[in-house]
Amino acid sequence: MERELPAAEESASSGWRRPRRRRWEGRTRTVRSNLLPPLGTEDSTIGAPKGERLLMRGCIQHLADNRLKTTKYTLLSFLPKNLFEQFHRLANVYFVFIALLNFVPAVNAFQPGLALAPVLFILAVTAIKDLWEDYSRHRSDHEINHLGCLVFSREEKKYVNRYWKEIRVGDFVRLCCNEIIPADILLLSSSDPDGLCHIETANLDGETNLKRRQVVRGFSELVSEFNPLTFTSVIECEKPNNDLSRFRGYIMHSNGEKAGLHKENLLLRGCTIRNTEAVAGIVIYAGHETKALLNNSGPRYKRSQLERQMNCDVLWCVLLLVCISLFSAVGHGLWVRRYQEKKALFDVPESDGSSLSPATAAVYSFFTMIIVLQVLIPISLYVSIEIVKVCQVYFINQDIELYDEETDSQLQCRALNITEDLGQIKYIFSDKTGTLTENKMVFRRCTVSGIEYSHDANAQRLARYQEADSEEEEVVSKVGTISHRGSTGSHQSIWMTHKTQSIKSHRRTGSRAEAKRASMLSKHTAFSSPMEKDITPDPKLLEKVSECDRFLAIARHQEHPLAHLSPELSDVFDFFIALTICNTVVVTSPDQPRQKVRVRFELKSPVKTIEDFLRRFTPSRLASGCSSIGNLSTSKSSHKSGSAFLPSLSQDSMLLGLEEKLGQTAPSIASNGYASQAGQEESWASECTTDQKCPGEQREQQEGELRYEAESPDEAALVYAARAYNCALVDRLHDQVSVELPHLGRLTFELLHTLGFDSIRKRMSVVIRHPLTDEINVYTKGADSVVMDLLLPCSSDDARGRHQKKIRSKTQNYLNLYAVEGLRTLCIAKRVLSKEEYACWLQSHIEAEASVESREELLFQSAVRLETNLHLLGATGIEDRLQEGVPETIAKLRQAGLQIWVLTGDKQETAINIAYACKLLDHGEEVITLNADSQEACAALLDQCLSYVQSRNPRSTLQNSESNLSVGFSFNPVSTSTDASPSPSLVIDGRSLAYALEKSLEDKFLFLAKQCRSVLCCRSTPLQKSMVVKLVRSKLKAMTLAIGDGANDVSMIQVADVGVGISGQEGMQAVMASDFAVPRFRYLERLLIVHGHWCYSRLANMVLYFFYKNTMFVGLLFWFQFYCGFSASAMIDQWYLIFFNLLFSSLPQLVTGVLDKDVPADMLLREPQLYKSGQNMEEYRPRAFWLNMVDAAFQSLVCFFIPYLAYYDSDVDVFTWGTPVTAIALFTFLLHLGIETKTWTWLNWLACGFSTFLFFSVALIYNTSCATCYPPSNPYWTMQTLLGDPLFYLTCLIAPIAALLPRLFFKALQGSLFPTQLQLGRQLAKKPLNKFSDPKETFAQGQPPGHSETELSERKTMGPFETLPRDCASQASQFTQQLTCSPEASGEPSAVDTNMPLRENTLLEGLGSQASGSSMPRGAISEVCPGDSKRQSTSASQTARLSSLFHLPSFGSLNWISSLSLASGLGSVLQLSGSSLQMDKQDGEFLSNPPQPEQDLHSFQGQVTGYL
């Protein structure tokens, strides 16, 4: 099995300690060969003690070795270290203090040993979990440390096999093809004649494309054959750091020459050697100093908002405990003072015969009460929450709806402690490219020398891809809506659903069969789908390219070949040369297939993510294939018949079997100790020459096509476009690039320098020597916003200058046109350098490369000096298709009350076009565009926009004066009054955003953005993205979520409260930095609206239940103090008191916290506005906490005094009377939990039954066998006696019901008269929808008479009320209207024919504005249902049916409670029948002017009243 490198991400958080480095190591690291004797020693001294490094500082310096150690404990340190870590949690310290306080004789309340049991149990459970995790890490470390590699030995003068853990800095390591790199190694030798090495970094960053690494520049010229014994060079490099994209340093050779070191010279630990027979290098960083392990910091610990609120409530409980204990202490002191003379009759004196003074007795009583009432602080709360969160994550991972079949990936939960935050998100910050779009760049249009080439044929080709997608979805939808008349059973609908999903799955498999088979048999090449590779050239441009080629073929031997071309043709030629060579694309020829064998990935974490934890205990439910993360293909075909599915399945099965055979026969690296020394080198060498070829690769070889592996999809798209015009990139080395042309043949350009792309310059350049002219040319491509500013100034005096201005003006117009069409734009430019200019620039550039400390700054300045006075060649437009389901997902998230901000680096026009396509912007809404050239202009524009917004929404005004804007802003919610206009959207570019994020303007910008419906930030850098998220999070105190797919989104993801990464084509950096990872953007809908809501609701109710339960139990003990002189005595036996919360009542609440579903998933998805309850913290807020505390106090009062009155005149002892009190408390807790439980499963019943059985079983056994264990209690035969007493059963029946009556009454009254959105959703979900026919199925095969296609299309978006039959829908509609319509709006009730069908409306129409101030689009839709005439009824029967709405209220699903709900709702039914039926006068009529979604509900009611 393969193991991923990031599995050791837990290393930093697991407590390992890196070996301490000596402080005098300096600001850089100097490394020399370990084969040389150390300075200051004799030559015979070879090597050094283990763990030591030989450096050029004249002495031995201790550095980290290559041993991987992620464990935290040893056998001796486990117990003290683990306890020390657990005591970092203040709750554990508190309970240990209480347990130790119980050992003081003067204040003890329980037996000391028994009081320690709960806290020891909690500590033991946590310790066992930590021990198991650490042991798993130890086994993983041992396996990795004992992997083998070849290290050069001076004694044997050859490479010998050594363990990874034995590698040291300065050792020479030889690696073969397909071998994992054991440390960070400087590449000194390669079997490739050009000194190249290909590595695969999928284990490190998830990118599947190969990266090129090259031997140190100049080293291969100094030595013809690398020999470690003769290596005397000195390496000076930077100290260890976690920057994967940077390596700075230089190597000084023995002749004094100095060469700069770059990231291209460094082989990183965890990467895999590909397509290279053998390489050798010297170890620079080892062990925990390698960049891979420095980046593996593990999942971040975040504290959820609910947990922060819970900690605050825990402090309130502590304060309440102190107050109760203080009250009891004062009471006991007063009691002792009053009965001082009579105390000797019933109190035990001290050892000297004296009695305690009232003050001393009060102090003792205070501490004793702290011990007795310690259960007020829930000891098991934190452990229970951790258990519930782990189980919640398990069920989220098991959700098949979050599995993406196309990419064979599913949701990953990387943070286990913030699942409830998913249900409280208010702001979503999203990247565009790769997040909202497919990140499949397709060359669409271009302009060269001011002439535009539309590529109409290419547009038609892309249209065929889209048609294929739509045809597939249409066929699937038709198959899914076939109506089977006469099948009314539920099993039939389930069978049809399963069949529909199967057909859809088969269709996907069949339409992508070719791409998937290629992916299964060979490693997937990123950005190389047929849609991306197959470019249809424009005929006019192709003719010009051919003309250039023919002219140059004739004039190539002349002195200036390019001079024979016209300026237009010269630009065309340079344009495609720039597209071909101005990149970092790696070319893989067909005769050089990517070799790959099954090897073990380097690192394995015991619990890297929850998926690893789950795979250890449960088999995977999801079908797993051999497709990579980047295996995305949009090529779809439509099968004409179902029989076409069978061959696809059989072929896939055959290929899967073939792959398994290949995997079994492929060689792998030995990982279990030493292999035999005999023939060891031969086995490594044979492995290096392994050439495994699969049918897919053979097919590619036969086709003779080159494989391009690019770091970005834009580069791949441009290279494929150039190849379509017969300008093919055929080879790339570190110092040359070869291009194939039809008539010219192969042209080899000397590659002098490559200035890579960065987010600040927003461009990249290459410096080459032209083979035809021997000139030094600079080709630059980048964003039009920067390249246009770098062009050579044109003079209007000469004709050439005017012509260039005209070309630039046309090009800019075409760029704007491309952006409006949603295309990504790039400008291509060129500069010719003279030899003097190049020599001057080269000198400064070499100095910048040799710098170690400030290399980035110097290289940036060097690139800026070079990329000036450019000549514009043309521009390109690249299309990036929108992901499937993005518009629908954005619409649902908006209905859920989420505000979506898109932060993209694209051009403003492009971003706006994509925003319209994904429905982020609507064509009918106003868009505020904020573009400023200076900070003063930005401030003025912000003031103007704020004035405009305030004039549109008068209620949304600034409460602070202008002078207070720099200090702070008063953020008021957007007004939702009837006179308020729809909120506009805001678009801002990167330059203006930089000004708006200044301290003086950030409050204005944030206030303006808060008033807008959507925000679109264009040309934003990664730093700006993180600053925007941080600003919203800190200023608005709102829950934020950031989602992205690339490395430029990492900072934004890490700053947000919840970070979501998309496993796209640009690697796994975003996923590795995220809390959750999803395959596609559309899965965010279900993750937030369904699982986020469930997780928040479950944990909120569970935490409240914990506080209620403990407070109620403490209340029983508190009321008893009034009858025992506040002496801190307890009527409940010690065993029950200590283990009640830990054993008897813990399981049911855990089951409810894991499995409860307050609203079904389909209802949450149909009505996303239900999500707002979590945003507003409706289920867990301070008000709910204190109401639960008051309810707990009342229940404890009832549960105490009912058995007290029942046994008032009896002669039972205090512990016999306390046992019924304990049983009553248990029954009350379980019934209370039953009321709060919305979804009952057999596990809920089992948990409640088990708790009851466990309590009575323990009581019976304890009362029989341990009667005198803990004096002074004597519980002998107590429970047996009570079980034979009818009074015991009567009190256990009456007390819980009496205690819960106020809660039952309140919930029934509130659920009937003032229901919340969630309660209405639950009521509607209980309606038996399956017995009525679905209109979509009824009319699937034909259009009903009298209905247009528009009406049928509207039915697809109808709410759940509209899918109900008329009688049920009208009842729910009346119920909603009655709760929201005021007497003024309704007017006088009019006589209504109750046989007239009622008008239908969407769910929660009346209450949609309560939580968020907005409502869904409303409209009355006429619906025809079979059998309507039979279901029309009289007024009496109509009222009777309306009463069924109150038959099962929202507080639970127990049938025996329904009578209370029915009784409380009868009064509302009478009012309902008179006020809500007035709206129905005619059947099938529509409102003339349906209200807009932004309008308030009362405006809609006013229109209805006016219409009636």
Swiss-Prot record:
Found in testis and in white adipose tissue. Also detected in fetal tissues. The active site is at 431 (4-aspartylphosphate intermediate). GO terms for molecular function: ATP binding; ATP hydrolysis activity; glycosylceramide flippase activity; magnesium ion binding; phosphatidylcholine flippase activity; phosphatidylcholine floppase activity. Its EC number is 7.6.2.1. Residues 694-705 have a biased composition (Basic and acidic residues). It comes from the Eukaryota. Mg(2+) binds at residues 431, 433, 1045, 1049. Its cofactor is Mg(2+). One of its GO terms (cellular component) is endoplasmic reticulum membrane. Residues 102-107, 336-366, 1123-1134, 1207-1213, 1264-1281 are exoplasmic loop. Component of a P4-ATPase flippase complex which consists of a catalytic alpha subunit ATP10A and an accessory beta subunit TMEM30A. This is Phospholipid-transporting ATPase VA. It comes from Mus musculus (Mouse). The gene is Atp10a.
